[in-house]
Amino acid sequence: MTDRNLAALLVARLTGTADHPRFTGAPIDLSTLDAHTLGAAWPALRRAEYEIMLRDHAYDDPRAEFARWLRGQIDALGLVPLVDADAALELFRDMPPGGWKRALEDLPCLDALPSPALQAELARIAGEPEDGEIRAKSAYGAYALDWFAGRRDFSARRDAYAQALADSPFRVRELDVLPELGPAALLALAASSDGYFAPKRLWIDASDPAVTLAEDAAYVAFAHDTLTEAARQVAALHAGAVPYEADRAFTIDDAQVVARAARVAAYRDEAWLRPLIGPLLTGVCVAPTAAKTAPSQSLAIALGHAVETIPTPESVRALRDALATVRHAGVQKKLARNLKPAERALGERPHTALRMTLDAKPDKKQLAMLATCMEAGFWQPMTLGHAEWRERLVDAPAGAAFSARMIWQARGSDGATQSFMPDITKGKVVLRDAAGNACEIAEDSDIRLWHPLLVDADERLAWQRAIVGRSLRQPVRQAFREYYVPTDDDASVSDSTMFEGHVLSSRPLLGVARREGWSIRAYDDGLVREFGDVRATFLVDARLYPGSQSHGTSRRLHVERRHERRWVPSPIGEIDPVVFSEVARAVDLLVSVAAFALDDDATRAAAAALTTDPVRQRDIETERWQRLNRLSDLPLGVMARHRKHVLSLVFAEPVAQGKITIDERHVRVGAWSVHCATGRVTRDGEPVDATIEPPPSPLRAVPWLPYDEALLQRIVDVVADLLD
């Protein structure tokens, strides 16, 4: 079928009438559908969506049903229409005067600048204010429509909006730069939520105009002037040159402009932002007096969102400094939520993140932030040349402390790989393999963090023994990192059943999900997280919302890849194996925490606090034991199997002496057994509460663990106590 015939068929289905309301017609093959063919049918589709589906709510109309089906196929294919001049004229003639929202949605689909006839239609649409009145927040849409309508005299628009925004000087100054912007920048601002922005952690798939604005020279210059002036005003406030009034330094509208300027500068990693962001963020968080107020809550929160979304080493450090000094409880709580996501997002800008090692002291906080950033290199493409690896990591103070405890993999120009760890002693660097032997790598090698999935079982075990033998605690779990391989059935589809069927408690699920960077899906039935250009959606049969206390069964894990500005389902087999492994590991963590309750005093105390009724407390305790009994009979998951492997290495000597045995699910010491997945303790098959006493003296040997995990630590403590 030709493109012209396919477009005609789509238009016929969207506009024709049927003899029966359940008419569906012959299936249509969309395998040849492209952007231009879709553009030819776009006016008919939009007409069906607005005039039939929205206005008449015609759920029994075949045209509406076909429009829903076609929209779903378009989204699945990731297609964006390209509308030519004739179709564009038809498209915009359907729009009523004042229909700004609809016009702004379709303007990005034009394949060329508007013709004079189309400009006249756009002028007609823009001639009446949206919703019948001038609204300050609609300025971006008005300017965009005027630009595409061929109007270049914005003076009347500017005067009307300046009057409405008289209390927000930064918004008024932004009006003066709007006529200098190109069409892409204007559309990006118009497509935003009236200029307001929040990170994806709060609004799923909210577009940030800063990315487009960063390519527009006029807005970049405006961003520099805006941040410089904002910093000057804050400095004057703290110097006493301006009287202090709590929360009056910047209006809510101005806060959005200043924060957007910060995101533009951060996206470009402008050098002039580095000395500005610290004093600005701290200055709007802390009153110049001893009061527990803030000069501007709105700007403090907006800058926190900016740092979380597009971080730089300097802005993350500024966020830490602000958290250490802020006295306003509400602002402190908001900014604290930005810190972990900011560190994680900084890892997705690896070359920007590594700047922190050049001038930073190797303190614990700096090392923790570097570790968080570098861990993102497992799912974000990150390789360094040999010279850059030496400069940014091995030879830098903060970088050396990190790199000397991590395993690295070098790939030469011939494709050969070599894994090694740097041994840094008195400034001398020797590269050593898993056996401890010195090795050499070529100067033209590319270096990345070693991942257990990239090597065979013998090499994994060799590095694990090396880490245990040196009692080395790695900043990022690496040698003992869990890895996941999709099944053959999953490789050809975009969803996996790997974690399906677990009963999850929503409260711990949402707690760990938020900490790890997941967001609640728009339909409240799943969690979403991005891993570079891969997006994972983990579905749960429960309504998820902050504070929910329900239970639900886990469903499938869906993966998508970014296609321009859309997400398109991708076969798992086409995703980088390490990236999928990291996605699965993140989901396994959710399942492990929400399905396997840690059987400790804190958990029991929290459950007991829910009621003072002795009968109810007894029921809670019985339910807890029944749940642990059920979980103890399940096959071990990947994390539990990994935990069992670590236990075999940590207790290698008692195992060799016959004091401990480790079977499929349990660690056994005489009549006692401890389950590797739940920590459940039994004696001769009867469940017991194992009381772990503190070490009687500092001389008591405490088993060393290669990484931190609460349940693993509990199992080790119980087993060590039983051995004594």
Regions found by a protein language model. Give the residues of each.
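Non-catalytic terminal/accessory regions
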Residues: M1-P311, V316, L323-D724
